[in-house]
Curated annotation (Swiss-Prot):
Residues that bind NAD(+): D34, A35, E36, Y37, D38, S83, L84, E112, R135, E169, K285, K309
Cofactor: Mg(2+); Mn(2+)
Family: Belongs to the NAD-dependent DNA ligase family. LigA subfamily.
Residue numbers annotated as active site: K114
Source organism (scientific name): Geobacillus stearothermophilus
Residues the record lists as binding Zn(2+): C403, C406, C421, C426
Name of the featured protein: DNA ligase
Domain BRCT: residue ranges: 589-670
The EC number(s) this enzyme carries: 6.5.1.2
Cited NCBIfam families: dnlj, PRK07956.1
């Protein structure tokens, strides 16, 4: 293709990809399968690599993430990003309303969900995104333009050539947060405490490729100077932003009076667990800009807005002890052992203590009355100590200096907060590697859970993953609660795992920094273990989302004689070393019932796991999301389906039972 043809085709591709991205990330209603989007993206990347001068500021390829930055520049906000005064009860809201009415008379309000994320400012010139910044101290923030470009719901070009500055909240959805922490746990990295910290940490990465891998989202909630654009009210501004192509939260309401505001607050206090993202309250703003101007602001916050904060569900219980565990990468993690207590609807007996620094900073002692909450309503964590309840019997805790399993000296590597055991033959690490290898996300060996692995390990029957493939029935039946039938089933599951596709084996090997998603990308790209073993650092970094740190870890792994020996053993036992999945560019069957549809899974499926069902739907061109909305096309309901099924029925969305679901995926295999 000559340059003129390339220029025309690049323009076509940009228009298509920007439209498809808007449908997918903003409207939540994709019109093409993911595979088609990926194919077009790869075509545009190839053109821009051949003709770099054709790359434009609104090109969707800008979302992949550019080279790492040396530091963040400071950005002065043209209009200050003020914080809001807080309200903690109905009385505070009525006091706010009374002050408003005293100044400007009756006023209508706009209520919006207060997203628990990171406030950002985004600036556009002639319709093009030119700069993004954090809130900082309200007058000066940090330039995070390159990281914000990686958020797919943020338009790089608006639908009109206007110049404006919008304000919004970048956040990490619950599903992305759980997935990220699972991947970090698999890599032996410290877990994020909550989705807000994860979002903030992602946007403050100097390497935009890291931000691109984190699946962040963004709602825009206002304009820095809306009246200059001829807009008279906040509700009009939100509608205008939405019309320009921004993602604006649909869960908002214009309220005629404070009673309607209080009803909205009460409604979302009960409904917030159903949301796919975290909120920590409701923002209430006077709707009229003329009234806002009349009310003015204090030095810290506007008088025309207030943030109602939901009370965090925190409970107090006793810290019985602190358990120290060694993970498969050698990271030593302290866990609080608690008197059982109910938090956010579940009984909690264990909670994260993060690391040694956290325990020291909070001065947490065994026997303390400690405050527990669920971080982002997801992970139980100790957030503080009730010092007034100390009676002198509490015991300060010190992290061990030697590994509790192998007694090797623990070390803290440069730049890390965690202590590590560096002994590669540490029994705890060997055991955890076996558990990881057999896990559902890796080799998926049914029946080979933590208890069975521990028995096998303690009996001296296995030391590394290759040993699993030479186990015999006679060895297994000697284990506790392992009869002949159970032994036969386990051996069959081990045998079946030999046929897994490469990405499962690759993830199961536990290479540092290589989570399930990276393993999938590597397997798709290299197709065989042999090619991956021979890959150079540069070839690895050519794979989307594989950065320098991961590439270094992969090359270091394959350079170890122990890794070479292990792979030779696995080959000898007949373990598959090739990628069996569809190429990302593959088309879904034309007659697929899932092609281009947004699907929600709810309840328990008898025939397969949730992840397996998701894989089947995506293989057939569908997209799986975590919550039911008007843009959902189909809900698949298993046993004990709950609120998602009810919402689907209310919205008139098509619902399938498991039998119909199996019918369709089996038809798609023909």
């Amino acid at each position: 293709m000559d340059r003129q043809q390339a220029e025309r085709r690049a323009a076509e591709l940009r228009e298509l990809l920007n439209r498809y991205g808007y449908e997918y990330y903003v409207l939540d209603r994709p019109s093409v399968p993911d595979a088609e989007y990926d194919r077009l993206m790869q075509e545009l990347i190839a053109i821009e690599e051949q003709y770099p001068e054709l790359k434009t500021s609104d090109s969707p390829t800008q979302r992949i993430g550019g080279p790492p930055l040396e530091a963040f520049r400071k950005v002065a906000h043209r209009v200050p990003m003020m914080s809001l005064a807080n309200a903690f009860g109905e009385g505070d809201l009525r006091d706010f309303d009374r002050r408003v009415r005293q100044e400007v008379g009756e006023a209508a309000y706009v209520c919006e969900l207060k997203i628990d994320g990171l406030a950002v400012s985004v600036r556009y010139e002639d319709g093009y995104f030119v700069q993004g910044a954090t809130r900082g101290d309200g007058t000066t923030g940090e330039d995070i333009t390159e990281n914000l470009k990686t958020i797919r719901s943020l338009p790089l070009r608006l639908k009109e050539p206007v110049s404006l500055e919008a304000r919004g909240e970048a956040f990490m959805p619950k599903a992305s947060f759980l997935r990220l922490n699972e991947e970090r746990k698999a890599r032996g990295e410290e877990l994020f405490a909550n989705p807000r910290n994860a979002a903030a940490g992602s946007l403050r990465q100097l390497d935009p490729k890291v931000a691109a891998s984190r699946q962040l989202d963004l709602f825009v909630y206002g304009l820095a100077d809306a009246e200059a654009l001829g807009i008279a009210s906040h509700s009009e501004a939100l509608d205008y932003l939405q019309a320009l192509g921004f993602k604006v939260n649909p869960e908002r309401r214009r309220c005629a009076n404070i009673d309607e505001v209080i009803a909205f607050v009460s409604e979302w206090h009960d409904k917030r667990p159903q949301l796919p993202y975290e909120i920590d309250g409701i923002v209430i703003k006077v709707d009229s800009f003329a009234q806002q101007r009349a009310l003015g602001a204090t030095a810290k916050s506007p008088r025309w807005a207030i943030a109602y904060k939901f009370p965090a569900e925190e409970v107090v219980t006793t810290l019985i002890g602190i358990e120290v565990n060694v993970g498969r990468t050698g990271v030593v993690t302290p866990t609080a052992i608690l008197e059982p207590v109910r938090v956010a609807g579940t009984t909690v007996q264990r909670a994260t203590l993060h690391n040694e620094d956290f325990i020291r900073e909070k001065d947490i002692r065994i026997g303390d009355a400690v405050i527990i909450k669920k971080a982002g309503d997801i992970i139980p964590e100790v957030v503080g100590v009730v010092v007034d309840r100390r009676d002198g019997d509490e015991t300060p805790f010190a992290m061990p200096t030697h590994c509790p399993e192998c007694e090797s000296e623990l070390v803290r590597l440069e730049g890390e907060v965690a202590l590590r055991c560096l002994n590669p033959n540490c029994p705890a690490q060997l055991r955890e590697r076996l558990i990881h290898f057999a896990s559902r996300a890796a080799m998926n060996i049914e029946g080979l859970g933590e208890k069975v692995v521990t028995q096998l390990f303690n009996a001296g029957l296995v030391r590394d993953v290759a040993d699993l493939y030479c186990l015999t029935k006679e060895q297994l039946v000697g284990l506790e609660r392992m009869g002949e039938k159970s032994a036969a089933n386990l051996l069959a599951a081990i045998e079946a795992s030999k046929q897994n596709s490469l990405e499962r084996l690759l993830f199961g090997l536990g290479i540092r920094y290589v989570g399930a998603k990276a393993a999938q990308l590597l397997a798709e790209h290299f197709e065989t273990m042999e090619r991956l073993e021979r890959a150079t650092k540069e070839e690895l970094m050519a794979v989307p989302e594989i950065g320098e740190k991961m590439a270094d870890a992969i090359t270091a792994f394959f350079a170890q004689p122990e890794a070479t020996e292990l792979l030779q053993e696995l080959r000898a036992y007949g373990v598959n070393m090739a990628y069996k999945g569809p190429k990302r560019s593959a088309e879904a069957p034309a007659d697929s019932a899932f092609a281009g549809k947004t699907v929600v899974l709810t309840g328990k499926l008898a025939s397969m796991s949730r992840n397996e069902a998701k894989e089947q739907i995506e293989r057939l061109g569908g997209r799986v999301t975590g919550s039911v909305s008007r843009s959902t096309d189909l809900v698949i309901a298993g046993e004990d389906a709950g609120s998602k099924l009810e919402k689907a029925q209310q919205l008139g969305i098509e619902i399938w039972d498991e039998s119909r679901f199996l019918q369709e995926i089996n038809r798609g295999k023909r």
